[in-house]
Amino acid sequence: VACRHVAGWDVGGVNTKVAHVDGGELASVCGRPFELQRAPGRLVPLLRELASEAGCPTRDVDVVHGVTMTAELSQMFRTKREGVAFVLDALEAAFPSSEVQVFAADGRFLAPPDARAEPLAVAAANWSATAHLVALDHPGALLIDIGTTTTDIIPIVGGLVAAQGKTDPERLASGELVYTGALRTPAEAIASEIPLRGERVGVSAEGFAIAGDAHLWRGDLAPADYTVPTPDGRPATKEFASERLARVVCADREMLDETAISLVADALARAQVQRVAAAIRRVVARHPWIDVAVVTGLGAFLAEAAARAAGLKVVPLGDELGDAAARFAPAAAVALLLARRRSAAEPEVVGPTSREPRAPSPESRAASSEPRAASNEPRAASSESRAASREERVERREPRADLVVKIGGGLLALPECLDGVLSIL
C-alpha cells in the first residue's frame, strides 16, 4: 500500500538519525548524538523528538517507519537478538499506530515479528541499505562509507550488492568492514608508531586521543562534527586537540610545537588512508572491472584519499543526494527504498538477484546545505524536476540486468560483456 510519508531510521549505539520522505522525495534529514547504553530509557522520547524535528506528521497512522540499526552491538546487550528486540520495542512504543518495516542485509523489508525471529538478518545492516540505494544509479562501483567508527567497502556488480559477507564477523573476514572511523577510533588502534623528528616513536596505549583529534587539527573536521565526548573531557577545539595529540607520544604542548603536532596528526591520518586503501585493493581484486568509488560518510575525505590511492575514480554521494543526506546515508536510503517499495507506481520486485526500481536522477533529488549538529533540511524538488525524474525513470527502466548464473547453491552476477563468451560456449 502506498504511503505519502516514510521515515527512515538508522539507530546506532552513539548516534540516531532519521530521514523523512514526502511523496517520494527526500524532504529532510536530522540526527542527534545519543549513547544508548548511558540512557536506554531516553530512546523512545528521542525517536518522537526526531520524528517531529524531521517534519513527520503527528498522526502515527500517516507514517510508515523503516529502520536499520547498529545499536544491537552495544555492550548493554548480552546478544544481538536482545539488542534487535530492544530497538524494535522502542520504535513500536514511540509510534504505536504506525507500520514498522525492518531492513535486512539481503535487501528485504521484514515485519517486526519476522525481524525478531531473524535477528542476524537485520543486525548491523545499515551498510546494505546505502549499497542498495547506490546500486540503483551505479551498477558497477565500490561504495566506501567511512563513519564515526567504521568503514564499509561494498562492491556493486551488475546493479546488485555483491558483498561477500552479511554479518559483521563475515565482513571483517572479507575486508568489507574495517574498524577505523573519522572520529571515535583511538590513536593506538590507528598506528603503533609514528615518525617524529627523524625517528620512529612508539604510540602510547592510554586512550589519550582519538581520530577526531587528528582530523580536527588538520581541518578536515569542524568542532561541530566532534559529536562524542573527548578523551580528556575538555572541549573539542584545535587547542585542546593538540594537547591530546601530544600525549599520544607521552609529551605535552611545552615539549611539542605546532609542527610536531602536525607530524603526529598527519601520521595518524596517513595510517588510516593506507589501511583503508589496502582493504579497497583486497575487495577490488575480487571484482577487477570496478574502477569507480562512490564515497560518503563523515569521513568521506578519508574515503576519497584511500580510493584515489587504490587507483579508483571518485564520485561523492553528496553530489547526488545532497551533503546532509549523504552524511545520514543509511537513514536516507531506508526511507527512499521503502517509499519506492510502497509506491503504487513502482511495484515491488522481490528476490536476492532482482533489480530495484531506479532512483530519481540527481537533478530531482533534494539539494541540501552542510549539516548542522542536529538538523538539516534538503530543499524539496520542484514539480518540473519531479516530472523530469518520472520521464527519466521511464526512459531508463528497460536496461536488462547483467547475466545471473547459478553455481552450486549460490548466485553469481556476470558483467554484460561476458554474454558473448558464454553464448559461444
Language model feature labels by segment:
Residues 1-5, 395-401:
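Extreme N-terminus of proteins, especially the signal/transit-peptide cleavage junction
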Residues 75, 397-425:
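Nucleotide/pyrophosphate-binding catalytic subdomain
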Residues 347-399:
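Short, basic, low-complexity termini and linkers enriched in Ser/Thr/Gly/Pro
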